[in-house]
Amino acid sequence: MERAVRESHLDSFVSDGSSLHEWVYGMVRTELGMNPNQETDKGNIILTDDLKYLREVMKNFGSVAKDYAKETYESFVHLPIEFPLAPDGHRPVSELFRKRSNDLLLITLDELKIPYHIVGGTIEERLQKISEIYQLKPVMSIEQAVSLAKKEAQNYNIVQEGK
């Protein structure tokens, strides 16, 4: 909801996620549990009554999120899963969670007929491809941008994926 409010005040924007991402994560959590981990990947999943109820809530949220996405987003850049999860203990997800989320997002984008570009490769390659797709004028080199981002990430104790 907060995302939609912020986006509504802008003429145009680039975002690192969407209402669809939030809905997808919620739906997959109702399937795999609130804290999917390696045990989840082995098939050890216990779905409580609370999760079953949450699934119904998420289905309803999904119709709103889908309508909003269809009206708001011109296109998506989809970054496929190419890097392993960082073993930092901060991400309450598993490889199975990532795969299911990835698949549901792509199915939903197709269902809604929202155009998307699948952009893979190293961080630098991804940035180059995205800049070309959207004809973005660089204000610094990609190498400089990545270097600055990595330095900033260190300030937040963020484990850097895709090195």
Description of each model-found segment:
Residues 30-121, 138, 144-148:
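A glycine- and Lys/Arg-enriched "phosphate-lid" helix/loop adjacent to the NTP-binding pocket
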Residues 19-22, 82-84, 123-124:
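Short, solvent-exposed loop/turn segments at secondary-structure junctions
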Residues 124-140:
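Two-component system phosphotransfer/interaction surface
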Residues 142-163:
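PAPS-dependent sulfotransferase catalytic core
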Residues 15-19, 122, 141:
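Secondary-structure junction/capping motif
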Residues 1-40:
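Conserved nucleotide-sensing/catalytic segment adjacent to the nucleotide-binding pocket
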Residues 1-9, 28, 81, 134-138, ...:
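Generic secondary-structure transition motif, activating predominantly at the C-termini of alpha-helices
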